[in-house]
Amino acid sequence: MRIIFAGTPDFAVPSLRAAAQRHEVVAVYTQPDRPAGRGRGLTPSPVKLEAIARGIPVFQPQTLRSPEALATLRALDADLMVVVAYGLILPKAVLAAPTHGCWNVHASLLPRWRGAAPIQRAIEAGDTETGVCLMQMEAGLDTGPVLLSQRIEIGEQDTGGQLHDRLAALGAQVLSDGLGLLRAGIRPVAQPQPADGVTYAHKLDKAQARLDWAQPAQELARRVRAFNPWPVAEAILAGERVRLHGAVALELAHQQPPGTLLAASKQGIDIACGEGALRVRVLQREGGKAITAADYLNARRDLPALR
């Protein structure tokens, strides 16, 4: 089976490997190289690096809407296009080009968390489970019928990065199952998404990572987990801005204003919130690396009252 694969970040790499294992991936589409790192040099996407390692031709158009881009894609004569976190909108003509259309691996249980950041939004919202859907793509944003799906639990301490890796592996397995069925001549039954329960996972940005101590500690702890490893939660602690890599909520009654440091030990730094307190365990000062609360306290000798 001739497959076009379209994807860009790390999340898509296991799915590319799954597609290439038993099928002919005739081309990989990925985002153009972007400036990255301290030198801001052009950096290829993880999917591009994987494709090059496998000897698969790589295409990096700025858009798929041009007649030239469509002609190039059609000339590949693909049976199926698999899309995993590609980052470009596919026009209707592209969706209709392959014999079996376009499949998408999406990291949520649709219709919950359509959109760009389903993994982080699930943690942020306090969801206890999530999963992966293999979807037949249509013109709407993640609105297509679901072909296959798998569920997993979200652990109480799962970070965005940890859940990302588990779902990337699960997505590859679900895709492999779907491709196996199609190769055997069995087209997965397309189940329309229900009209109820639709939510949207809006794109992450650094501004959303700034914590407000007036919010409940439970909400803040979930955001710390969700935004690890990016964009990483940040807040004002003891008069300086820090990034929070690890924290837990405490059901602690207090009468202190939000943001007040309540206690500190090698177990963590307890900060008053609108409800309860947040115990910060791992944090990062500006220009530094992530350190434990104990190491932070050793560096902040100006806080004797907290020891």
UniProtKB/Swiss-Prot annotation:
GO terms for molecular function: methionyl-tRNA formyltransferase activity. (6S)-5,6,7,8-tetrahydrofolate binds at S108, L109, L110, P111. It catalyses: L-methionyl-tRNA(fMet) + (6R)-10-formyltetrahydrofolate = N-formyl-L-methionyl-tRNA(fMet) + (6S)-5,6,7,8-tetrahydrofolate + H(+). It comes from the Bacteria. Its EC number is 2.1.2.9. GO terms for cellular component: cytosol. The keyword DNA repair does not apply. Belongs to the Fmt family. This is Methionyl-tRNA formyltransferase.
